[in-house]
Amino acid sequence: MKFIKALPLLMVAGLSLVGCNKAGDVENIKKTGFLNVGITMYEPMDYFDTDGETVIGFDAELANAFAKTLDAEARFIVIKWDSKVLELNSGKIDVIWNGMTITDELKKNIDLTIPYATNYQCVVTKTANIADYTSADSIKDKKVAVESGSAGEAAAEGVTNLNKVTSQEAALLEVKAGTSDCAIIDVTMANSVVGKGDFTGLSTVSADLIAFEKEDFGVGARKGSDLTDKLNVFFKDSYKSGLLTSLSTKYNVAINDATLK
């Protein structure tokens, strides 16, 4: 499968129709031939292949497949996660498609699709220190790295010493470097990268010891956008066709069977 390379946000700003008719997003995408997809580097959802430029992953494959239904091509744009709603509503991107947790706060500002995947937060620390984490109280006095604006930051409520960084990957690197004691990140990402490559020497604390609530992932579109209904139909069709199940197995991502049937 062909994947388009990611573009910096500023390169795309001049190509986007800022302030376009939200109800006509589908028509605009068909005219331009591009679906602008806001992402961060988040393995296994959206991340660079070995060439350092081509975006692959669970969400990337879905975005490519959805774009084809609009006779368009997915164009992946790396954004700052804590600015995702601003980037969407400014028209610089058409959708946020990056393992995004559905929250009541997001619902106030953007439209969200049906839940297509599930997730929960987890604690990651150095393997040598994992015995220090036996309950939720274990992290209260720790220096905890979180991605700014993420579900991990929300889950860290009550922690007094937060180290807010630009991505979940950066949060893990803070732990690896010893500048934070632990990180709170998506288990979806932890299952894919912890203990491997740059994150060798890190381990995930068992959910039996420190548990967080289940979350649902959805794709974000502008309020009133006609993309939302199209995306919901796409997710249900992809479930029926077996595409979602196949990608779930390939990338070890839990899909939301209950809402997709």
Predicted regions and their residues:
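C-terminal motif of bacterial Sec signal peptides marking the signal peptidase cleavage site
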Residues: 16-19
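Extended ligand-binding regions for polar small-molecule ligands
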Residues: 21, 60-69, 148-150, 214-254
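Ligand-binding clefts/hinges and TM-proximal coupling segments of bilobed small-molecule sensing domains
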Residues: 22-24, 151-166, 203-208, 233-261
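Extracytoplasmic small-molecule ligand-binding "clamshell" domains
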Residues: 27-99
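Flexible hinge/capping segments at coil-to-helix
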Residues: 28, 126-143
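Short helix-initiation/N-cap motifs at beta->coil->alpha
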Residues: 60, 76-87, 131, 148, ...
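A ligand-binding cleft/hinge motif common to bilobed small-molecule-binding domains
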Residues: 100-108, 155, 181-213
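Periplasmic-binding protein-like
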Residues: 118-125, 195-236, 254-261
